[in-house]
């Protein structure tokens, strides 16, 4: 901050707080006057009285026209607005000391020391083997990665240090422009005291000053923004180097892990081959009978089972030959090769998986076929039953009329016995619904009064309801058969039934409704 700016700020504070300052002057003068007693302190007492009088004159000055102009001149909203804009630009540069990259520089130094240690750790000529070659390769990779990290740390440290200097320079420029506006406030305030034209001249001068200061601050601010973008691009490049080093380390670790696996496989194969050779020699010296189909390593018949364990009859360590799916154990012992055993295991696993996948599918297809067959059988039975009922309904009217004519001339009881025997024989030959006729005859046999008067009970059924109404027990599958009959009216039909559970032979008559086959009303014969 400049000296003129400090003076201007102090003067503005005094003008704004003029009443408080006048009161302070008055209190200080009265204090000095009260305590300055005696001839030697007379001058001090006079100074106190003068200071008290000045407080009154100070207040009177600001109440005058000149004092009011000074108050108005001190209150410059134009300069205050310019300083506020510059302060906002300065806040974008942060608060406090910027990061100078010192810690990244220290990290680069430590990594350089680690790189020097790795550089001195190369194998010497005394160590020459496959292990030394592997160690040399790994050490080279570590040294390369350390150098890359050192370079990245140095780049970041340099960028942060340069940006810290740029931020400091920008802050200085912005502060200088704000201070310049504060210094010019004394000039503009004096210009505003000029009568008539002072206020207009002050306003024009302040606008020009703010334009100049804010313009210079804006140029510096935009320059700082461009430099910050460049610095950010360099930092992003350094981040890419860090990520490349990390990815290289991961790839190296993965390669080492993958490279260790093949080395163990030849060892296992060699052990297996040696064991096979020893077992072969022992079998040539001491032959052992091959296990039969019941005690050997048989596989399951499903096509996917793995071979079972070796038979207890053979010697320990004797390899068993896996038998084909669905067959027993091998009949002759054969040396099992590692490749054949692996292929057999793979085939067994594949068969198990395929069996597990296709098993549910076969069950579903079988269920669908079974359901289709049941549906076809039910449809065939329903069609045959409907055709049979339709034929009975069509032949019923003629038989009923003939029986009615004969009943008028002959004795009802005698003719009823004959008709009963006749119908009984027809019912057995045709094989049509014996249970329905037994229920109808049972209802006719229970009512003795209607048996004595057959014509009187022809209009009602066993429940006492009108036989012209459809029966409540009509099966749904007779609706199609009922549509074939177009006749109207009711005709009596003599139906004979032989009760299988008793020696009683009862003749009963039934009235069939032509419109709805199966609807019957029983009456006595």
UniProtKB/Swiss-Prot annotation:
Keywords: Cytoplasm. Residues 244-341, 375-494 are annotated as: Disordered. Residues 248-258 have a biased composition (Acidic residues). InterPro entries: ESX-1_EspA/EspE-like. It holds the Pfam family EspA_EspE. Residues 274-286, 411-440 have a biased composition (Basic and acidic residues). Its main location: cytoplasm. Residues 292-306 have a biased composition (Gly residues). The keyword Cytoplasm applies. GO terms for cellular component: cytoplasm. It is found in: Cytoplasm. Residues 307-319, 332-341, 375-397 have a biased composition (Low complexity). This is ESX-1 secretion-associated protein EspE. It comes from Mycolicibacterium smegmatis (strain ATCC 700084 / mc(2)155).
